[in-house]
Regions:
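C-terminal motif of bacterial Sec signal peptides marking the signal peptidase cleavage site
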Residues: 11-14
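Bacterial signal peptide processing site
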Residues: 16-18
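Acidic/histidine-rich catalytic neighborhood of metal-dependent amide-processing enzymes
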Residues: 126-228
Length: 321
């Protein structure tokens, strides 16, 4: 998925929270359905560009969103990577109430990383990951959001954007503020907006939100550059009783798909659980998991849960009621 600026030392910060106060869904959003949709993505296998599962997964997303939303369009282009590889990529935009002038943008990436470069087993490092959390969880969430909005229309127009090529290679930024080897889909969309005057009220990137041990801190770039959106999202979560999952502490600065939008002045924040793996009970925003699943072959379906998708889905639908 992305890169994080982890602190060198494990931070505990006295954050010994009650780990689980989940008392059931707060809306009719269906977390179990979101999990099933994520499983459908995982069943296609690794979904990195150029692999058989890539187009199968994209075709499935397009077909499912056409059943549920008012319009579906694609952006297709050939991307040249930092090493000169040519990738055939696809962004998918599903719109609810497309005629509404007031709009909210939700973003997730649907591709998976082509190599498990953080796997501790050196024999696994060149293998593509399944991306149950880092890829499929966001897709599952968005298809279930489309289910919800079809039955309960939002108060504004909602754009559900599935971006491709997020997780291809290095997350290094160049002197112009561009990312030559990753974040391809979000950069392409930010440079090819649906219209010249496209300016959503706010945007939220949902990434790695299926972790069964859900702990979402406020991403540092989002806090610095779109604090009003961070406040809106975390206040909504608190009102739903989810303040021990959406933790009101500033976490790490993450290179992710919100960055190209922020560069263009579109206030998109990053909602993600970067600490993917078991955490000690007394943890903080810089605590490393005891076992890391991120960018490894351990990012498998058994690591994500309907409960986590329910929590995030409840927040997402409440934001646009």
């Amino acid at each position: 998925m992305l890169s994080a600026l982890f602190t060198a030392l494990v931070v505990t910060s006295g954050c010994d929270k009650v780990r689980d106060r989940f008392s059931g869904p707060k809306t009719t959003f269906d977390g179990a359905a979101a999990l099933a949709y994520a499983k459908a993505q995982v069943d296609f296998g690794p979904r990195a560009p150029g692999l058989p599962g890539h187009d199968k997964a994209a075709d499935w997303i397009v077909a499912e969103m056409k059943k549920r939303t008012d319009s579906v369009s694609e952006q297709r282009w050939t991307q040249t990577t930092a090493k000169g590889t040519q990738l055939a990529l696809r962004n998918i935009l599903a719109r609810i109430n497309p005629s509404a002038t007031q709009r909210v943008l939700y973003v997730t990436h649907w591709d998976t990383r082509p190599v498990a470069d953080d796997d501790l087993n050196f024999g696994n490092k060149t293998q593509p990951i399944l991306g149950a959390n880092d890829g499929a969880s966001g897709v599952g969430l968005f298809v279930a959001l489309a289910d919800y909005f079809k039955k309960t229309p939002p108060s504004v127009g909602v754009d559900l954007l599935f971006v491709d090529g997020e997780d291809w290679g290095s997350f290094d930024v160049d002197t112009a503020g561009n990312y030559p080897d990753a974040l391809f889909g979000s950069q392409y969309f930010a440079n090819h907006l649906p219209s010249a005057d496209y300016k959503p009220l706010f945007g939220v990137l949902f990434d790695m939100i299926g972790d069964a041990d859900l702990q979402i801190y406020q991403e540092a770039n989002s806090v610095e550059r779109a604090p009003e959106v961070v406040s809106r999202v975390w206040q909504t979560a608190a009102e739903l009783g989810y303040d021990n999952y959406f933790i009101k502490e500033v976490g790490q600065a993450i290179t992710d798909d919100h960055m190209p939008f922020l560069k263009k002045g579109i206030h998109v924040i990053d909602v993600l659980d970067i600490q993917y793996g078991p955490l000690p009970s007394n943890h903080g925003p810089g605590t490393l998991p005891t076992t890391n699943y991120h960018h490894t072959l351990q990012d498998t379906f058994d690591k994500i849960s309907a409960k986590s998708l329910q929590i995030v889905g409840d927040v997402a639908v409440t934001l646009v009621k």
